[in-house]
């Protein structure tokens, strides 16, 4: 498993304006992660993304 910022098609992390932890948690769990939250960036950060399920890349820092 890996942790990181899941990215959209434009290689930018998913924004979570308003620090919406529920949005990020759902987004991450939909990607089969253990959980997720909104960090100060503000972007969604996921914990426990399975390597074999995650098709798109993740970033370890930064929005784009």
Curated annotation (Swiss-Prot):
Residues in LCN-type CS-alpha/beta domain copies? 2-64
Keyword Transit peptide on entry? no
Q: Which Pfam families match?
A: Toxin_3
The superkingdom listed in its UniProt entry is Eukaryota
Report one GO cellular component.
extracellular region
Q: List the disulfide bonds.
A: 12-64, 16-38, 24-44, 28-46
What GO molecular function terms would the record report? sodium channel inhibitor activity; toxin activity
Name the PROSITE patterns on file.
LCN_CSAB (PS51863)
Q: List the expressing tissues.
A: Expressed by the venom gland.
What SMART domains does its record include?
Knot1 (SM00505)
* Gene3D superfamilies for the chain: Knottin, scorpion toxin-like
Location in the cell reads: Secreted
Where would you say this protein principally sits, based on its record?
A: secreted
InterPro entries (UniProt xref): LCN-type_CS_alpha_beta_dom (IPR044062), Scorpion_toxin-like (IPR003614), Scorpion_toxin-like_sf (IPR036574), Scorpion_toxinL (IPR018218), Scorpion_toxinL/defensin (IPR002061)
Keywords, in A-Z order: Disulfide bond, Ion channel impairing toxin, Neurotoxin, Secreted, Toxin, Voltage-gated sodium channel impairing toxin
Electron transport is among the record's keywords: no
Q: Name one GO biological process term.
A: defense response
Q: What is this protein's function?
A: Alpha toxins bind voltage-independently at site-3 of sodium channels (Nav) and inhibit the inactivation of the activated channels, thereby blocking neuronal transmission. By extending the depolarized period it indirectly affects beta-cell voltage-dependent potassium channels, thus increasing potassium permeability.
The Swiss-Prot or TrEMBL note on domains reads: Has the structural arrangement of an alpha-helix connected to antiparallel beta-sheets by disulfide bonds (CS-alpha/beta).
To which protein family does this belong? Belongs to the long (4 C-C) scorpion toxin superfamily. Sodium channel inhibitor family. Alpha subfamily.
The protein depicted here goes by the name Alpha-toxin Ts5
